Amino acid sequence: MGSRDHLFKVLVVGDAAVGKTSLVQRYSQDSFSKHYKSTVGVDFALKVLQWSDSEMVRLQLWDIAGQERFTSMTRLYYRDASACVIMFDVTNATTFSNSQRWKQDLDSKLTLPSGEPVPCLLLANKSDLSPWAVSRDQIDRFSKENGFTGWTETSVKENKNINEAMRVLVEKMMNNSREDIMSSSTQGNYINLQTKPSPGWTCC
């Protein structure tokens, strides 16, 4: 029996200089550099995982520049994404509070086929630095109030919790994919023209 491929698009967003590009490089190539140029627009990377004996997962990682939240281009960048990562710098309170704006922007422009928000992890990056500008209790409350799948502290520099966090996200996407397949198989071919569009869907 051949291997089955799953292709997922994952957004990596957050303010400038919180470590998005470093995260993508660390996760996709297991490399780290202190010297990265600011991303202009969007950058891409691919991560391939042998998920099981019969399943291969290919992740398209979209590293979106911090200033892009203020442009109309984000709708184009977000299209067809299966999940997202929102990052902030634990030593910078402004990047933490702006995570809410990033989440709101995502939720207003992107949903799963079911109409539900895409799974989204909140990563408290640069946890190797001190002092922290926000407490763990603040982050935990913020994560719950804003509908994140969950949060964890990370250090891209020290490679702390990167693979573990992404595995949680992949598991969530795989579960959603299986649910979509099950839903499609039970619906048959009948088209119900009276069904209202799912919340969050807009005509492009």
UniProtKB/Swiss-Prot annotation:
Top-rank lineage group of the source organism: Eukaryota
UniProt membrane topology term: Lipid-anchor
Annotated positions binding GTP: 33-37, 39, 126, 156-157
Family matches, as CDD domains: Rab32_Rab38
Tissue specificity: Expressed predominantly in kidney and much less in brain, heart, muscle, fat, liver, spleen, adrenal gland, ovary, thymus and lung. Not expressed in testis and intestine.
Motif placement: Effector region: 36-44
One GO cellular component term: Golgi apparatus
Record SUPFAM superfamilies: P-loop containing nucleoside triphosphate hydrolases
GO MF entries: dynein complex binding; GDP binding; GTP binding; GTPase activity; kinesin binding; small GTPase binding
PROSITE patterns: RAB
Modified residues (Phosphoserine): 72
Coiled-coil spans in chain: none
An annotated GO BP: cilium assembly
Annotated Pfam families: Ras
Localization (cell): Cell membrane; Cytoplasm; Cytoplasm, Perinuclear region; Golgi apparatus
InterPro entries: P-loop_NTPase (IPR027417), Rab29/Rab38/Rab32 (IPR030697), Small_GTP-bd (IPR005225), Small_GTPase (IPR001806)
Lipid-conjugated positions (S-geranylgeranyl cysteine): 203-204
Effect of residue 21 to N: Abolishes localization at trans-Golgi network (TGN) and affects the integrity of the TGN. Inhibits retrograde trafficking of M6PR-associated vesicles
Modification Phosphothreonine occurs at: 71
Keyword annotations: Cell membrane, Cytoplasm, Cytoskeleton, Differentiation, Golgi apparatus, GTP-binding, Lipoprotein, Membrane, Nucleotide-binding, Phosphoprotein, Prenylation, Protein transport, Transport
Subunit structure: Interacts with LRRK2 (via the N-terminus); this interaction is direct and stimulates kinase activity.
Protein family membership: Belongs to the small GTPase superfamily. Rab family.
Function: The small GTPases Rab are key regulators in vesicle trafficking. Essential for maintaining the integrity of endosome-trans-Golgi network structure. Together with LRRK2, plays a role in the retrograde trafficking pathway for recycling proteins, such as mannose 6 phosphate receptor (M6PR), between lysosomes and the Golgi apparatus in a retromer-dependent manner. Recruits LRRK2 to the Golgi apparatus and stimulates LRRK2 kinase activity. Stimulates phosphorylation of RAB10 'Thr-73' by LRRK2. Regulates also neuronal process morphology in the intact central nervous system (CNS).
Name recorded for this polypeptide: Ras-related protein Rab-7L1
Organism this protein belongs to: Rattus norvegicus (Rat)
